[in-house]
């Protein structure tokens, strides 16, 4: 039997022993020189190693980079089409947000607060819950519904087109009519002073009335 002692070797290598390979147990842990040895039983924990845990979450203090490409994205799982955020465009300089059947909702006041929410449906319809302020809004379609936003050319065309129907215009600043004017009553703020003026009621003598003109 070989006599094992400090410095004994096997095949030229020093035999490990408590002195040169210190292993110690601490409960269910095994320590090497006071350092914990991880194993299949004792796996690394996020809190011990500054990891972000799949189960417990965590906080990144530095940037997270997702490389450009159709297969590189941040995905939010659901029971339908996955919701994804990725870079798009020819060089990855476009933000692409892919929604599902419920559309996309932007909530400026908080993820659980619908005040001020902006919703985009899968059909491309956008709904605002508050007023929209912009230097200009461009409408590419001719309005058809009563609630549609109209276009300047549509309004200008309706105003500037003078026809013989009810859309014919009379300028408030003064105008000349080529047809008869019929109204229940006409109110004149000033009395007639020229032969072409229409007289007011207080300037005429009522038919069949008795007038006392006095003595001449």
Curated annotation (Swiss-Prot):
Disulfide bonds: none annotated. It comes from the Viruses. One of its GO terms (cellular component) is virus tail, fiber. Keywords: Host-virus interaction, Viral attachment to host cell, Viral tail fiber protein, Viral tail protein, Virion, Virus entry into host cell. It holds the Pfam family Phage_T4_gp36. One of its GO terms (biological process) is symbiont entry into host cell. It is found in: Virion. Structural component of the distal-half tail fiber. The distal half-fiber contains two molecules each of Gp36 and Gp37 and one molecule of Gp35. This is Tail fiber protein p36. The lineage of its organism: Viruses, Duplodnaviria, Heunggongvirae, Uroviricota, Caudoviricetes. The gene is 36.
């Amino acid at each position: 039997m070989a006599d094992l002692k400090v410095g004994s070797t096997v095949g030229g290598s020093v035999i490990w022993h408590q002195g040169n390979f210190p292993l110690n147990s601490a409960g269910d842990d095994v320590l090497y020189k006071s350092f914990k040895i991880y194993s299949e039983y004792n796996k690394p924990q996020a809190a011990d190693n500054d990891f972000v845990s799949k189960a417990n979450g965590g906080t990144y203090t530095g940037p997270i980079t997702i490389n450009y490409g159709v297969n590189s994205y941040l995905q939010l799982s659901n029971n339908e089409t996955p919701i994804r955020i990725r870079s798009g465009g020819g060089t990855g300089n476009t933000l692409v947000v892919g929604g599902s059947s419920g559309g996309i909702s932007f909530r400026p006041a908080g993820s659980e607060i619908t005040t001020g929410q902006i919703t985009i449906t899968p059909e491309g319809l956008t709904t605002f819950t508050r007023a929209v302020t912009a230097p200009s809004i461009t409408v590419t379609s001719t309005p058809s519904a009563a609630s549609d936003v109209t276009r300047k050319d549509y309004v200008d065309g309706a105003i500037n087109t003078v026809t013989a129907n009810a859309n014919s215009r009379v300028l408030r600043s003064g105008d000349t009519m080529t047809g008869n004017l019929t109204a229940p009553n006409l109110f004149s703020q000033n009395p007639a002073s020229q032969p072409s003026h229409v007289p007011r009621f207080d300037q005429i003598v009522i038919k069949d009335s008795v007038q006392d003109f006095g003595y001449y």
